[in-house]
């Protein structure tokens, strides 16, 4: 911000901020005077020293309206400058904004521009940092003008000379010194900042730019081009920031009226020499204060010390120059001055940083004051402390309403004190503010009455740290309570993630009218019932409330009054109060309204009415069928008393899941007000009946099933069988491990199911443990398994922090917690439990950092327009596999989106949703149930084409209000919160399982999902006999081809219902054309290894398989069986030698039919020369299955890896074209894979030896198919399949981690917002005639604008007889040249020859979120994120302008954010009345908006 002499800082309305390098003139213009002395304050008077670092004359008075000497006191002398001490009479606040300066004796280089990477000064002068350093620190001279002596000696400009060389020339050519400095014949060489200043001043940037562009075009050397490009970037930055500003032309002179004379321009902006400082600015003294401590000492800011060093050295140097000290001494002093200024600007970069005397820590320089969490940006500008706030412990307030909170009186009186004082004075209870304060301190009873009136209708904000999403701050209506703890409504705990074990919360008071309106309309807790991350309700009853509702609505056979018929609901309640009917009794009630129920009510009549009352039975059945009588329980009638009429009668057992669905349904049907009322009612009912039920658990409630012993015996027998197989040599160690783990996993699940069933049947389902579990109040099946079944397998904690899963210990814990564990079992289980606790603390920080990066990358994504008009969309298909494996349903993916094209039911050929329509919850549910709709094209943020922000049609509905998103919604921040919040939650929840392993049982059988007809596609199978476990020989069909497919088709329509990929080596159980029923086994496969099978009969022949070289033989000491495993053979051979282990199938004559390469780690199953039948296993490649589930420790690093777009550790090699695979030559460390297509295009890939190749000779592959195993790199997907594919890949992969690892629901649109930001940039390939540079990383929008700018321009090839201002090779507007040509033709002169201007080309770039946040268009936002000094240096050099478009930069400069109610279009709103009489107008910028928002 600019202050000029005598003015105050700009406080007015500004819309953008420009960054540039400060010129000496601008530093002087900001300054109020020169600081000449290093002193701060006088040690006796404690008053600032004149001309010192705290001088009142320069920086302003230390006391309001009082000069230094005391001649002028009081405000009436405002603005007078004292004639005695020279201090202006004004407020002391000016000491926060007035600056001073230090005039340096010699120019000094600014360390930021010299030490930044790449060095800005180095790039302009074409000098390395090392050479620059030697010049700047007075080690060598640099030639500025070689002159005549230089020519004779062969010295050029920019050459470095040592002291000896310099003095040799000086003494040799003595008369040279007599020449003028600007004489071209004079030899001039200098050192230090002065030399750099002179060199920079003499640069011709335009000439350098032309030469560098020439190198770029013509040079063949890649290195030269890279260097030229690096330099050109800096040169162009200076040229762009130093553009002429055209003045208004008074009158034209000269013969050519169209010629522009150079005087008509003023140049402003950066000059290279500004990077060398002649004047150092001194920041205001209040920003580097001196604070008196007790004991008469002072604590000072480090900056004062650093400034002192500069002033002392500068004054000493001036004195030395005056007394004409020897050059050696001067040079040393100049170097010390340079170092002092370096330390002032950036002390942390230096190896020999200036340290403090006592504690020996480096002093904090100006750079350190900006950087990091404690720096100016993050500490003071983004996070401020707030007045009118307090904090206290929270306790539960069960009798509060949803929008209320209990505020302790002592806290309220403190927070609302000014308002109370005002009321007391207004009412005349107190005479003055002072007496009102006394009344408050005495706690006079009248004060409480006034306080009650003051807080009426005034909301307060409650916040619990950490505030991970927007529901972490909500508004409540305070009610005054005794005590010192804040009371919180139990239903808002989930949103705050609060519990009552000592948590604290902060209270804030919104002061202005606008803030109060926003708090009550937008932030009130009863308006925030839905989670923005998934659209699901967040105010869901839990624990006691759920238990109470469950107990109330549960039926018990044989309760008092069972089978009675009641005339009305009221009658039921009377009967219950009179104890004629029990709470759980099943009864009949006359009711003909809407009913939501699960069970078949007619069937219940036979159970409830005795056989002898046959007529009554028949009558009741007919009444029930006519929907006139309802079968329900007394408890359900009581529960439904609180139900809104519109919803009808809920005749279900209410558990947590049902309650959640019910609340979601209510909020969409009847709105927030009634839903909030209902929530308060069921809260009371829940707590009430939990108390009446009196549920508690004892040891006897945990029942261990008797069958447990039998199951464990079976498991022990099965695992012994596996060990026997292993001993026989038919299984590898890896397979043995996997199978044993499977056996125990199955047993554990079996015992768990039986113990669960046992609990369910105990006491008619009224076992307290079972009720807690079944209602969803507390506990999980997993915990019941550990309590009453067996603890099962335990995960061994992982050793690395990189997120690889730990192994499962194959010996399970057979005991459960009721029986008690043995010492060994206890030891094993402590292993996992401790890991959970340590993980929590380590990973919370990681999750928090992820959230911060997400916020930074997406903070400027705001809904700016209604419709961008794009025709593109996202293609979504129904995927049965994902839906059955518990992933996101088709319905969830399309819900709340706008259809990009008509969604059609292909069976009936009718349009279900028209293009441009919103797919509501009802429409989405209908589409889910309609098999005719297989796919849909929806509008998405990923394809939105708006230039700034996004459009509301592409985003779809706002999940928390189920309406199309409004203009100004900060969807980027909501996306970041929605992804970051569960990440943090997940890491905090790992230890609840107690470390028990939950990995999936490896599924070997694939079953039919639909009934239909089998169609086999590319499935080649052979008959193969195998010996089963029982020793019986069986014939099976084994698939010997890769990538075969099995389709299930509808026999009537021929439509494919489901596709399955049949793996290589699978046993197939069905034939082509066979009809199958649902759940019939189609094929089974071995999940633990990849098999290599013989496809034809013949004999095995080993090629390059040599014992001790390419394979090792391991003999099992117990079994004597030898296992052959291929090993990494490279270390065993000389550099020239190479091997490629493979097994060939040969005919009897020895002719090779087919060869199979065998990768490292594979186990051989045949001997050399063995006879083979089709389907025989030649070798197996073991797979590592990730079995440890339920722990996001593995998930969080994965999410980070995806968001940072990192290349995986061992990526797959991916084919870039469609074609056929062939293998080329083999080198020592790699082999060649070629992919060739029918058009003659060929790509060659080199695969490291030992990596498993998935493709075989002759395989057909598609572009993007992996040729080797490993994870596919997102960068490869972008390069080969384009931006759309990589966007879909990232969204799906991240979604998988959250879904599978943690069961957290996040709507796709949030992930899409982040992924969109990762693909915002393009890299320029060819710059064409635009002002871009090749290799530039720029915004897509900037790139399009640059191309549009040259679209209508032409380049002049031959100027013909054009006026002098038309130059060859330059760009001009087409219409101007056409006009000139017309005139030239008229005058029979030769015309101008032109060609169209070339446009730039580019390719999209995928950036990780950290890089994307640093590459943001906003300088302020990037600087506050990371690498502050680098960002500011680059911005200053390029003269960047921050347009303040995002949220962060506006918060930093103290403006309203351009989102929500702070949108610019709302700023000028005024409320006015149409009534004729006068009304008070609320002068507000956001009263109207708050209503518009709602």
Swiss-Prot record:
Zn(2+) 1 binds at residues 67, 69, 82, 85. GO terms for cellular component: DNA-directed RNA polymerase complex. Binds 1 Mg(2+) ion per subunit. Its EC number is 2.7.7.6. The RNAP catalytic core consists of 2 alpha, 1 beta, 1 beta' and 1 omega subunit. When a sigma factor is associated with the core the holoenzyme is formed, which can initiate transcription. NCBIfam families: rpoC_TIGR (TIGR02386). This is DNA-directed RNA polymerase subunit beta'. It comes from Chlorobaculum parvum (strain DSM 263 / NCIMB 8327) (Chlorobium vibrioforme subsp. thiosulfatophilum).
């Amino acid at each position: 911000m600019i202050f000029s002499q005598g003015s105050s800082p700009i406080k007015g309305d500004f819309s953008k901020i420009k960054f540039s390098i400060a010129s000496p003139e601008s530093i002087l213009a900001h300054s109020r005077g020169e600081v000449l002395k290093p002193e701060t304050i006088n040690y006796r008077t404690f008053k600032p020293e004149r001309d010192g670092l705290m001088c009142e004359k320069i920086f302003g008075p230390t006391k309001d309206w009082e000069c230094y000497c005391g001649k002028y006191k009081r405000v009436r002398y405002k603005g007078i400058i004292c004639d005695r001490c020279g201090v202006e009479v004004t407020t002391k606040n000016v000491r926060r904004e007035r600056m001073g300066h230090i005039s340096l004796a010699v120019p000094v280089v600014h360390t930021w521009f010299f030490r930044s990477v790449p060095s800005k000064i180095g790039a302009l002068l074409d000098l390395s940092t090392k050479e620059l350093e030697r010049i700047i620190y007075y080690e060598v001279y640099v030639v500025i003008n070689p002159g005549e002596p230089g020519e004779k000696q062969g010295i050029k400009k920019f050459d470095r000379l040592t002291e000896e060389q310099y003095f040799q020339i000086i003494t040799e050519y003595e008369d040279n010194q007599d020449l003028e400095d600007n004489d071209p014949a004079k030899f001039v060489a200098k050192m230090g900042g002065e030399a750099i200043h002179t060199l920079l001043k003499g640069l011709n940037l335009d000439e350098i730019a032309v030469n560098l562009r020439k190198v770029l075009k013509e040079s063949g050397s890649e290195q030269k081009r890279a260097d030229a490009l690096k330099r050109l970037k800096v040169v162009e930055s200076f040229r762009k920031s130093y553009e002429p500003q055209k003045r208004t032309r008074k009158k034209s002179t000269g013969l050519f009226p169209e010629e522009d004379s150079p005087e008509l321009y003023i140049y402003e902006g950066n000059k290279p020499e500004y990077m060398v400082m002649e004047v150092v600015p001194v920041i205001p003294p209040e920003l580097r204060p001196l604070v008196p401590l007790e004991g008469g000492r002072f604590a000072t800011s480090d900056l004062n010390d650093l400034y002192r060093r500069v002033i002392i050295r500068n004054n000493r140097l001036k004195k030395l120059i005056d007394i004409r000290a020897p050059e050696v001494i001067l040079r040393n002093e100049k170097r010390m001055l340079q170092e002092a200024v370096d330390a002032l600007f950036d002390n942390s970069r230096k190896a020999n940083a200036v340290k403090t005397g006592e504690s020996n820590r480096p002093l904090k320089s100006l750079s350190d004051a900006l950087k990091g969490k404690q720096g100016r940006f993050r500490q003071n500008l983004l996070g401020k402390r707030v007045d009118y706030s307090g904090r206290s412990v929270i306790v539960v307030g069960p009798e509060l309403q949803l929008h209320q909170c209990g505020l302790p009186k002592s806290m309220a009186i403190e927070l609302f004190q000014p308002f109370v004082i005002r009321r007391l004075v207004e009412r005349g209870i107190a005479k003055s503010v002072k007496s009102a304060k006394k009344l408050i301190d005495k706690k006079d009873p009248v004060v409480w009455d006034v306080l009650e009136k003051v807080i009426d209708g005034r909301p307060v904000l409650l916040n619990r740290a950490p505030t991970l999403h927007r529901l972490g701050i909500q508004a409540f209506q305070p009610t005054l309570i005794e005590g010192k703890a804040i009371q919180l409504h139990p239903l808002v705990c989930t949103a705050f993630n609060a519990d009552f074990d000592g948590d604290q919360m902060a209270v804030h008071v919104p002061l202005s009218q606008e803030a109060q309106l926003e708090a009550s309309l937008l932030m009130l807790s009863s308006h925030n019932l839905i989670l923005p991350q998934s659209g699901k309700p967040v105010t869901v009853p839990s624990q006691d409330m759920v238990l109470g509702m469950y107990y109330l609505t549960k039926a018990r056979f044989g309760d008092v009054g069972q089978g009675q018929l009641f005339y009305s609901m009221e009658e039921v309640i009377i009967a219950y109060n009179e104890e004629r009917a029990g709470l759980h009794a099943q009864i009949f009630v006359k009711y003909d309204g809407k009913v939501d129920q699960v069970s078949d009510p007619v069937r219940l009549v036979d159970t409830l009415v005795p056989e002898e009352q046959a007529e009554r039975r028949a009558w009741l059945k007919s009444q029930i069928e006519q929907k006139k009588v309802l079968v329900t329980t007394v408890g359900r009638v009581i529960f439904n008393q609180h139900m809104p009429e519109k919803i009808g009668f809920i005749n279900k057992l209410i558990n947590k899941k049902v309650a959640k669905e019910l609340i979601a349904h209510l909020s969409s049907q009847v709105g927030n007000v009634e839903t909030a009322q209902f929530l308060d009612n069921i809260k009371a009912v829940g707590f009430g009946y939990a108390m009446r039920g009196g549920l508690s658990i004892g040891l006897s409630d945990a029942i261990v099933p008797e069958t447990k012993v039998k199951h464990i015996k079976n498991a022990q027998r099965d695992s012994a069988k596996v060990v026997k197989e292993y001993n026989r040599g038919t299984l590898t160690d890896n397979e043995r491990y996997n199978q044993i783990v499977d056996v125990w996993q199955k047993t554990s699940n079996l015992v768990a199911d039986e113990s669960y069933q046992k609990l369910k049947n105990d006491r008619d389902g009224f076992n307290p443990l079972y009720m807690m579990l079944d209602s969803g109040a507390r506990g999980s099946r997993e915990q019941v398994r550990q309590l009453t079944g067996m603890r099962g397998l335990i995960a061994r904690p992982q050793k690395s922090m990189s997120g690889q899963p730990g192994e499962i210990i194959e010996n399970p814990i057979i005991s459960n917690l009721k029986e008690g564990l043995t010492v060994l079992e206890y030891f094993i289980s402590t292993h996992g439990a401790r890991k959970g606790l340590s993980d929590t603390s380590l990973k919370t920080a990681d999750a928090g950092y992820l959230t911060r990066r997400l916020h930074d990358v997406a903070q400027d994504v705001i809904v700016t327009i209604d419709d961008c008009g794009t025709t593109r969309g996202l293609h979504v298909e129904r995927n049965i596999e994902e839906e059955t494996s518990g992933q996101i349903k088709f319905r969830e993916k399309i819900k709340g989106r706008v259809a990009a094209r008509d969604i059609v039911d292909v069976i009936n050929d009718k349009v279900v949703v028209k293009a441009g329509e919103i797919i509501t919850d009802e429409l989405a549910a209908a589409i889910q149930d309609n098999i005719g709709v297989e796919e849909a094209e929806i509008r998405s943020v990923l394809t939105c084409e708006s230039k700034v922000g996004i459009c509301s049609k592409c985003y779809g509905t706002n999940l928390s209000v189920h309406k199309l998103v409004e203009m100004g919604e900060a969807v980027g921040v909501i996306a970041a919160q929605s992804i970051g919040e569960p990440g943090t939650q997940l890491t905090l929840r790992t230890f609840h399982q107690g470390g028990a392993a939950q990995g999936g049982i490896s599924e070997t059988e694939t079953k039919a999902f639909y009934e239909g007809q089998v169609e086999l596609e590319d499935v080649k199978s052979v008959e193969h006999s195998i010996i089963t476990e029982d020793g019986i020989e069986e014939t099976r069909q084994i698939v010997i081809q890769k990538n075969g497919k099995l389709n299930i088709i509808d026999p009537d329509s021929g439509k494919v219902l489901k596709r399955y990929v049949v793996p290589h080596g699978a046993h197939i159980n069905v034939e082509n054309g066979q009809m199958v029923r649902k759940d019939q086994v189609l094929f089974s496969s071995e999940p633990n290894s990849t098999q290599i099978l013989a496809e034809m009969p013949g004999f095995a022949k080993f090629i390059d398989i040599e014992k001790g070289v390419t394979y090792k033989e391991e003999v099992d000491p117990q079994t004597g069986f030898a296992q052959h495993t291929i090993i990494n053979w490279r270390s065993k051979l000389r550099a020239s030698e190479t091997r490629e282990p493979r097994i060939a199938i040969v005919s009897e004559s020895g002719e090779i039919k087919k060869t199979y390469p065998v990768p490292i780690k594979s186990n051989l199953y045949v001997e050399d020369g063995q006879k083979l039948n089709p389907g025989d296993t030649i070798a197996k490649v073991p797979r590592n299955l990730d079995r440890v589930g339920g722990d996001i420790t593995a998930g969080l690093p994965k999410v980070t890896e995806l968001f940072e777009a990192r290349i995986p550790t061992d990526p797959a090699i991916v084919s870039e074209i469609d074609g056929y695979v062939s293998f080329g030559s083999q080198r020592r460390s790699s082999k060649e894979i070629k992919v060739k297509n029918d058009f003659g295009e060929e790509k060659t890939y080199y695969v490291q030896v030992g990596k498993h190749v998935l493709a075989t000779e002759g395989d057909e592959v598609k572009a993007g198919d992996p040729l080797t195993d490993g994870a596919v790199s997102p960068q490869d997907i972008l390069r080969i399949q384009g931006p759309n594919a990589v966007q879909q890949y990232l969204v799906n992969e991240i979604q998988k981690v959250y879904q599978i690892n943690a069961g957290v629901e996040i709507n796709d649109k949030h992930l899409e917002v982040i992924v969109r930001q990762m693909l915002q940039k393009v890299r320029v390939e060819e710059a064409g005639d635009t002002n871009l540079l090749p290799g530039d990383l720029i915004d897509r929008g900037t790139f399009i604008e640059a191309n549009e700018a040259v679209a209508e321009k032409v380049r002049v090839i031959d100027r013909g007889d054009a006026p002098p201002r038309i130059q060859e090779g330059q760009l001009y507007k087409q219409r101007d040249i056409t006009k000139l040509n017309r005139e030239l033709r008229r005058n029979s002169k030769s015309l101008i020859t032109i060609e169209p201007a070339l446009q730039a080309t580019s390719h999209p770039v995928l950036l990780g979120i950290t890089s994307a946040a640093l590459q943001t268009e906003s300088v302020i936002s990037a600087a506050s994120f990371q690498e502050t000094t680098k960002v500011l240096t680059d911005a200053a050099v390029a003269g960047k302008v921050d347009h303040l478009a995002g949220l962060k930069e506006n918060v930093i400069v103290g403006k309203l954010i351009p989102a929500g109610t702070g949108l610019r279009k709302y700023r000028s709103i005024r409320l006015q009345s149409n009534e004729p009489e006068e009304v008070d107008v609320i002068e507000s910028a956001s009263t109207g908006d708050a209503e518009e928002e709602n």
